[in-house]
Amino acid sequence: MLLPLPPQSSKPVPKKSQSSKIVPSHHDPSEKTGENCQTKISPSSLQESPSSLQGALKKRSAFEDLTNASQCQPVQPKKEANKEFVKVVSKKINRNTHALGLAKKNKRNLKWHKLEVTPVVASTTVVPNIMEKPLILDISTTSKTPNTEEASLFRKPLVLKEEPTIEDETLINKSLSLKKCSNHEEVSLLEKLQPLQEESDSDDAFVIEPMTFKKTHKTEEAAITKKTLSLKKKMCASQRKQSCQEESLAVQDVNMEEDSFFMESMSFKKKPKTEESIPTHKLSSLKKKCTIYGKICHFRKPPVLQTTICGAMSSIKKPTTEKETLFQELSVLQEKHTTEHEMSILKKSLALQKTNFKEDSLVKESLAFKKKPSTEEAIMMPVILKEQCMTEGKRSRLKPLVLQEITSGEKSLIMKPLSIKEKPSTEKESFSQEPSALQKKHTTQEEVSILKEPSSLLKSPTEESPFDEALAFTKKCTIEEAPPTKKPLILKRKHATQGTMSHLKKPLILQTTSGEKSLIKEPLPFKEEKVSLKKKCTTQEMMSICPELLDFQDMIGEDKNSFFMEPMSFRKNPTTEETVLTKTSLSLQEKKITQGKMSHLKKPLVLQKITSEEESFYKKLLPFKMKSTTEEKFLSQEPSALKEKHTTLQEVSLSKESLAIQEKATTEEEFSQELFSLHVKHTNKSGSLFQEALVLQEKTDAEEDSLKNLLALQEKSTMEEESLINKLLALKEELSAEAATNIQTQLSLKKKSTSHGKVFFLKKQLALNETINEEEFLNKQPLALEGYPSIAEGETLFKKLLAMQEEPSIEKEAVLKEPTIDTEAHFKEPLALQEEPSTEKEAVLKEPSVDTEAHFKETLALQEKPSIEQEALFKRHSALWEKPSTEKETIFKESLDLQEKPSIKKETLLKKPLALKMSTINEAVLFEDMIALNEKPTTGKELSFKEPLALQESPTYKEDTFLKTLLVPQVGTSPNVSSTAPESITSKSSIATMTSVGKSGTINEAFLFEDMITLNEKPTTGKELSFKEPLALQESPTCKEDTFLETFLIPQIGTSPYVFSTTPESITEKSSIATMTSVGKSRTTTESSACESASDKPVSPQAKGTPKEITPREDIDEDSSDPSFNPMYAKEIFSYMKEREEQFILTDYMNRQIEITSDMRAILVDWLVEVQVSFEMTHETLYLAVKLVDLYLMKAVCKKDKLQLLGATAFMIAAKFEEHNSPRVDDFVYICDDNYQRSEVLSMEINILNVLKCDINIPIAYHFLRRYARCIHTNMKTLTLSRYICEMTLQEYHYVQEKASKLAAASLLLALYMKKLGYWVPFLEHYSGYSISELHPLVRQLNKLLTFSSYDSLKAVYYKYSHPVFFEVAKIPALDMLKLEEILNCDCEAQGLVL
């Protein structure tokens, strides 16, 4: 058995001459199917109908390809022997063709056509019996009109198996089985193919032309070579056809019946049934495609490309070995094809590529093929081919590697696939960096599969195919990270409805360049700048940092600053700011893990600075807890750093700044001066003073001696007490950390003075802490120290405390000692006092004196009362009432004076932090004074204070940590407080308790950690607000404390989202809303921030009531920090918008449009979303553009080819109306791929404005959504989710008739349900004006829309909101239908109860 020789680059000339002789001379003019295709076809096939003829031509061409390949390989002697035999066979064929044609015509009338394949001569030596048995191959295929076939090709180019009839499949399978029956038989068949090709000159010519792609025929040898290439490319398909042809030839020669052939074929089928059936289907589909286009050669070019594409990888893997065993491998490939349809195709391509000359010629031909169609078409075709490879056999796992080269059209398809494969990941990078490359490199398989159809489109572009491709293109974006850039391609292809896909090319480039390049390229500098910013932040001045922090907090407020959820709405730089805001918040939460994604923002530098600061804060917060020593030192040393960290450690910075203030504090009082001098010495360690005081107490082994000294001091003079008290007031006011700690400790003393044992207990704890000396230990173990002091020491301390109760001087000492201790004990006991005031404490308080009892009551009152201001006032009054004395009065007055007249230095230095400290310190001072009065202060007080001062001179890190922890918990522990006691929170009492808890501090470490978290998530602007407001409050002492405390407390409550989530029921209007408000107050001035800052001030403090109880919330607008928001007229503006939207209600206009459908509109909107992202426009621009399109289409008829022009022009008008810097007309011409002229755009603009009568100030859903968000204080993520839901409706035509205000309300309502924030629903109902029952039907529809959004082919909005910049809200699963129904039913029931 002779094996086939390796393919030769050239074939003997005699073959072609002989084959040309075989072809009969009577051919119909319809035989020429291609533009340049001058092939000769056997008469039997010519007699068929044009469609069947083309199908026959396809099959024959495929068979001939195989024969061509086989011709060059058999040994020369056989070729010559076959030539004679071929002549005889050809004569027989010519004789029988007419009769056969008539019979076939009759069958065509029944829509059945039998394809007579040109006889294939098999070598007599191998399969003699086959040749002798006559068989008329009747490949029955349902003849379809070219139109239907075109549609099928466009829609299901790959589903070729469905079309061929059973006979077709069986025949082909039989032919294949003949080939595969045995290796030697296959060889013989291949050898037969040579004479077959020699016989049919027309076949050779036909094959040559598809390979040459309409180029002039080269020499016959070259043509034969190309045929071999095509043969290898179409190995499976052609082999099947070859076998069929061979069998048909033998049948015709022997004139046997079909049955005999079937029997033999059945015997042959044993191996390759499935293998060949698949290629058979493909062949039939190919035939149909050829019939559709009438350009067989042109059509075959794409198949070649497909094979080359598929084979690119395989060719790389096995470049040479298969050249020699090409024919053998063909059979093997067919056999393997059964297992791997895809592999067979790939191997074919491999074989093609493996023949070097074949690869070269193939590449050249493919290039020529590309050159002929426009480059745009070429791009489409390669993609289509890959799609075919991918979808037909699912073998196109190759990725559109070849597509890139195909698009270039001048580079070999085979050579670049490697590079493409090598860097699939880089394609994403290049995708963002080089949109043009993206266009060329549609890496996603979906794109490839979609583009497969365009091959037909290139030949006969129709409107349907562009749409199909557009849909397919939408799928491609799934893989790539920067979907928006890829989607431009999708949009453009979708707009291919105009009949040309090419116009989509530039929009892609434009969008990708503007959108992803900027996003991806800039991230690196962004990160670098973050680092530099972190370094620079420390050097920046405190004040400058504070404002930045304010802005940053405003921008960052993710959950707390619910109103910053509209960063995208910033009209100045909406997209950049949006991304920046969202990124910063995300980066804070994620700790910059998503920096790569954050890089999408072009202008995140400022935000990143802020974010970096926050990161540093967060990082420092953790060490602060763990190792507060270094952190605190650094903070005290570098107030600027404190302010940088002020977001996370605002209290800490305040305490430090207070220290600085204390250093610069006025010397109004000698005692305060001394304190200041002490502070100046230990400015960095103000907290350590208290600790040192404790240390001194501890060091003075004889605490009794200190007590004696206190007694002696008491004996010395009461005047000293007065002066001391006055100084204490001033000191407390000025001592930011000391006063705070003293106050807190004294508060604890008030609660602990009753149980002095605890006081001494704390002292020993302090001693333990002091012995430890390390701040970390202090921070981590203060609780442990409190919990683990030895029992003996506790007993002795308790006894001493009893003695102290008997001797007030001792009490004073204990009080003084405790302040330091209290800083630690303060954390635990205050909670215990608030939560579980021990009876022991009560008894103790009662026993020592009425003052202690009053003091205890005051502490309780503080917890119960709404604000520290009232608490302080109450304390003052109670203290004065209990023990009216000039000393007390003077003390309070002095404290008030100090508060009223803080030194200018203090004001300037600590305007913001001072306010906090002043308010807290003043309260503490008042409280301490009250305590002292209650305790009957004596000179012992003076001594006790003086001693702490001495201690302050040698501060320790412990005090610093204590002060910082104390201050920080006061400001930031509120979320925990609210969570700990949700029921106790009332409109005011909640705030008061929060403050008292903040002072007394629950577990400080936990609070600090939570505060850090909250700061990282969204540094509370409420704190900043509290800083700013206290200044004005300080000027008016009476109101100062009230307003300051309110503002201060409100931020505490609202800064952390935990409060609301943990205690929604207990949250009253004031506390909940106020907190939300404070978060948003210091927002940027952009519109989105303006509306998001809707939570600037708490709503009027009504009881927890339902919306019915809520009076119109003027507070929402009256204190807006954004002057552009026009808070004075916010209500009137909102009412006007609702009235005006009635004038722009849309009706069902699509029925009046002749050429445009709702699907086309959806494609256009999807494209406009991409344009908005690419140009970085605001959301308002997008919404308005869509609204303009709808209004225009409602009043005028638009043609399909002008739809994109309409969309681009409407977007241009909207940009002029909404944007500060709108794109130029040329930019819009460019994104349309220059399909329209500048004059056309301007003309369309005039037309739109005339139709709309220039009335384009149209209320949109986004405006209402902003307003609702401002009113109900949603957090950033919830607001972004509602925006996503609302934007999804833009593509859906059936939402066009909904009112914008109602659509916005329903979107926000669904977002609240999804985020489990149902307790805000009554507020939404109140402010929107829509009842919940009105919104429920729309909510159901929106939930369905979200449920199936991931399955929608138009994914521009989905990908946009899947980005981390938008919190990836698109990935939040929609509510289950049953669960949603339960929620809606509960709401309805609740509403019924309220009514």
From Swiss-Prot:
UniProt-recorded name of the protein: G2/mitotic-specific cyclin-B3
Domain free text: The N-terminal destruction box (D-box) probably acts as a recognition signal for degradation via the ubiquitin-proteasome pathway.
Functional summary from the UniProt entry: Cyclins are positive regulatory subunits of the cyclin-dependent kinases (CDKs), and thereby play an essential role in the control of the cell cycle, notably via their destruction during cell division. Its tissue specificity suggest that it may be required during early meiotic prophase I.
Gene name of the record: CCNB3
Main location: nucleus
Superkingdom of source: Eukaryota
Subunit-structure text: Interacts with CDK2 kinase.
PANTHER family in UniProt: CYCLINS
Species name: Homo sapiens (Human)
Outcome, altering R60A: In cycB3XA; prevents its destruction after completion of anaphase
Motif (D-box): 60-68
InterPro entries, alphabetized: Cyclin, Cyclin-like_dom, Cyclin-like_sf, Cyclin_C-dom, Cyclin_N
GO cellular component, one term: cyclin-dependent protein kinase holoenzyme complex
Gene3D superfamilies: Cyclin-like
Ranges annotated as biased composition (Low complexity): 10-23, 42-54, 1082-1093
